[in-house]
Amino acid sequence: ARLLRHLRYIVVDECHTYRGVFGANVSLVLRRLLRIAKAYGAEPTLIFASATAADPAGQASRLCGREVVAVTEDAAPTGERTIALWEPGFIEGAEGENGAPVRYPATTEAASIMSTLLLEGARTLTFVRSRRAAETVAMRAQEDLVVAGRADFADRVASYRAGYLAEDRRALERRLDDGDLLGVATTNALELGIDVGGLDAVVMAGFPGTVASFRQQAGR
């Protein structure tokens, strides 16, 4: 009761992720919380945060049922970004259906690009679509680095995905935070919630499914 009586702010981070059935449930929870707070005499201010929502005011309004003022002027310092599209090359001598040429898999190319960036001194985060792909890309990048004579770099490449034990996940996050890891192949588990600083490059092996996810991953 004391908390509700003195409630001043409710902060909802990454509000663009609350959509569909999940978003409807969050919306109901927020509205119920506001009604209970009002019953205790509190009128908390709602703060919604998102770096990728196409219509931030509309999204926030749908979640809370109130009129929302959008603050869209970005004053955060950001460096210049370059977005490049990479098409995998053809596998020499390989033929597909009806003799069609076959391209290298996206994961193979992603690992090659990742290792090249690491050799150039760029801390790199590589997003893939599955847990298995995260393990595969990290392993292939390590192999490329060893072949290039940088086994020391290979030891500083890892994969990150859901399903790890909590202590293993925290250990990887600490290595990311302190700069010990130079390269990480990950699923969308690193797309949200964890601050990854000091990155130089992001590789996406395929379109992540939504424009919001693309912006979120590219902005890491």
Which positions does each model-derived feature cover?
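Helicase motor core with emphasis on the C-terminal RecA-like subdomain
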Residues: 1-220
